[in-house]
Amino acid sequence: MPSLSTPPSQNLAFSPAASATSSRLTPSSKRSFYPHRLPDPTALCRCSSSSGSNSSSSSSSDDNPRWDSAIQDVLKSAIKRFDSVLSWYATLDNDDGEQGSENVEKIDDDWDWDRWKKHFDQVDDQDRLLSVLKSQLNRAIKREDYEDAARLKVAIAATATNDAVGKVMSTFYRALLEERYKDAVYLRDKAGAGLVGWWSGISEDVKDPFGLIVQITAEHGRYVARSYNPRQLSTSAAGAPLFEIFLTLDGKGNYKKQAVYLKWKEIFPDVPTMPSRTLTPGRFLTSPGRKEDTGNLAVESSEDEESDNSDDDSDLLEESSGFQSFLRDMIPGVKVKVMKVTAPGRVDKDFISKVIEQIADEEDEENDLDIEDIDVEDDTKAEIDEKNADIELESVTDEIIDNNGGREIAVKFVIGDIVDRLSGNQPLKESLRSPANLESVENSSFYLRLEKDLNVKESKGVEGTTLVDGKGSRQSRRRIENIMGDLAKSIEKEKKISVKMLKDVGELLSLTLSQAQNRQQLSGLTKFRRIDVTPSLDPLDGLYIGAHGLYTSEVIHLKRKFGQWKGGKESKKPTDIEFYEYVEAVKLTGDPYVPAGKVAFRAKIGRRYELPHKGLIPEEFGVIARYKGQGRLADPGFRNPRWVDGELVILDGKYVKGGPVVGFVYWAPEYHFVMFFNRLRLQA
C-alpha cells in the first residue's frame, strides 16, 4: 500500500504588497475605528522552500499543488468574513451616530414654555400610569397572584426609568452612604436633592403677615412643595400642592430645572351653581307686595348704610340661588330668613351637613338656645319695628355670662374649625401651571420668583381663575376688631342679639374664610428658609403649635441663644455689657398683628432669672420652671410694635398627649392673658 509523502516544510514570506496592506491595517487619525478593506488576498504571501535544490522544490510543488490552493481558499474565506463583520459594525455605528446626534441636538436646545408644558404632560401621564400599576400590584399581592405581580413589577421598573428625580435621589443617598461627599454636594446643589425637606416662606414684596409652611418631597420627575396650615400639621393631614420643580438632563450631562407655581381654579363641583347670565335679582328676591313659592325659604335684601362693601351686593346675591337649592336638598321644609347675603365662601356639601349635624347635636345636649321661627310678611313691617327682629335669649344667657364668655369661646372654636377645614383640607381638583424661577438656592434658603407677565397672560384665557386681591377685604377688616367684644356686651346688657350684630358676625366669618383661602397663595418674591426638624428632648428647642386670637393657630420655633437681646434696653456702655443665655420664639405663621418671621416672645433663662413656681398658673398643672421675659404686642398691620413684661412657663405635660407644654403670660398694662403651645413634631 503506497504511503502518502509528507509535504516539505515551507516558510511564509510577506511581499511588499503584503507589507503595504499591513500598513493599511494600522489605525489612521481620520478613521480611528475601522481599517480599510483589504485588496486581493493572493498578494498576501508566496510559498518558498527553506532548503533543497530547484528541482526538488519544483517537483514537490508539482506533486502537491492542492496544498497551495487550500491555503489560499482558507485565507480568502477568512478575509471575506472579516470584511463582512467590519462593514456591519460600521453601518450600525453610523446609524447610531446619526440618531444620537439628533437626540443631543433636541436636548441641547433651550426649551421654551411650550416645550416645558409638553414635558409636564408627559410626566403627569407617567405618574398616573405608575399609580395605576402600583394599585394593580397591591391587588395582585392580596389575591396571591404572584405571576401577575412579577409582571407588574417589571412594568413599574420600566416606567420608573424615565424618573430623573428618582435617579438623583437614589444616587445622592448612595453617595452619602459611600462617603462620596463631592458627588453628594454636586447632586444637592445642581440636581435639587437639597430642596427636599421642610421650609418656611415669607413674602418679600407683598405685606402678607401669615407666612407659609411647605414640605418639598421627591416625586416622579419633579419635586412637589405642599403647603400646610397649623391644623393640618397637628392632625397629620395632607397639604395642598403649592409649586413644583421639574428636572431634566441634557445631552451634556447637565441638570436643568423649571419651577412652576400652581394656581388652583376656584371650582367646587359639589356645590350647586348656575351661570351668572341666567341669574337675575327677580328670581330670588321676594318683593314687598307678593311672595314667591320657594318652599318656605325666603331671602330678603337689607341694606346697611354703614357697610363698606355694599357695592358687591349684586355679586353676592347671585350665589344665593345655589344656596337655596342646597338648603332645600339638605333640610326639606326648612323656614329660613336670610337677612343679608354675605360671601362665606364656596363650601362643600358634605362639610356643611357635618356642621349642621354638629350644631344640632350640641343644641340637643346643652339646650342652650331656643330659636323662635320668624315669619316673613313684608319689608315695611321689618323697617318700622326693627326690634321685633331681635333674637331673644332664654335664661340660659345668665349661665353664659357667668362662664366668662364661654359662648364666645365656642363661637371662636367653630369659626376656627371652619377656617381650618376650608383653608386646605378640601382637595382642589384642577390647577394652572405658571412659570417661576428659583434664585439664590443655598443649603438653608432659596427664593421663588413668579413671572408676572406670563401669569396675567395665562390667567386671561382660563375661566374660573382669579388672582388674589386683598383690596375687598381691607375695608371690612377695619370693622372686625371689636365685633366679638360688642357681641359679648350685647348679650350681657340687653339679653338679646340684634340683627345688626348678626350681620357683623357674618361679615367676620366671611372675611376669616376668605383670608384662610387666600393664605395659600404666592405673589412676587418669596423667601424660604429651612426648618430644622431634628428631634430634641430640650423643651426650649423645637417647634410648637398653639391657638391665638380669632384667626388661626400659630406655629413658633423656640431657639436657645447666647448674647444680648436685639432692641432691648440694655446699657450700651462697654463696662456694662452683659451676655446671657435666652430663648426666642420666632413665628413661622403669623397674624394681622404680629406677622410671620417676627419674635413673638423672649425670656432670659438660667437660675439667675428663674422665678418661683407659684404664679398665675397653679402648681397642679405641672409647672417645671418660670422665667422672666418680654412679649411683643402690636396694632393691626404691625403698627406700634412694643414689648411688654411677661413670663415664660414650662409645664411637664403629664396631662397632655403631645408632651411638654410651653406657655407665655403677657402682663400688658390694659389686660393680662396667657398663651399655651404644644410640641409639634414634623416627619423628616
Curated annotation (Swiss-Prot):
Record carries keyword Membrane: no
Pfam families for the chain: Cyclin_D1_bind (PF12014), UVR (PF02151)
Entry annotated with the keyword Kinase: no
Region spans: Disordered: 1-66, 278-318
Localization terms from the record: Plastid, Chloroplast
Transit peptide: 1-46
GO CC field: chloroplast; thylakoid membrane
Keywords: Chloroplast, Plastid, Stress response, Transit peptide
Residue ranges, compositional bias (Acidic residues): 301-318
Residues of the UVR domain: 127-162
Induction: Down-regulated by H(2)O(2).
Residue ranges with Low complexity bias: 48-61
Biological process annotations from GO: singlet oxygen-mediated programmed cell death
Reported effect, F528C: Loss of activity
Function, as annotated: Together with EX2, enables higher plants to perceive singlet oxygen as a stress signal in plastid that activates a genetically determined nuclear stress response program which triggers a programmed cell death (PCD). This transfer of singlet oxygen-induced stress-related signals from the plastid to the nucleus that triggers genetically controlled PCD pathway is unique to photosynthetic eukaryotes and operates under mild stress conditions, impeding photosystem II (PSII) without causing photooxidative damage of the plant.
Protein's name in the database: Protein EXECUTER 1, chloroplastic
Provenance organism: Arabidopsis thaliana (Mouse-ear cress)
Lineage: Eukaryota, Viridiplantae, Streptophyta, Embryophyta, Tracheophyta
Gene designation: EX1
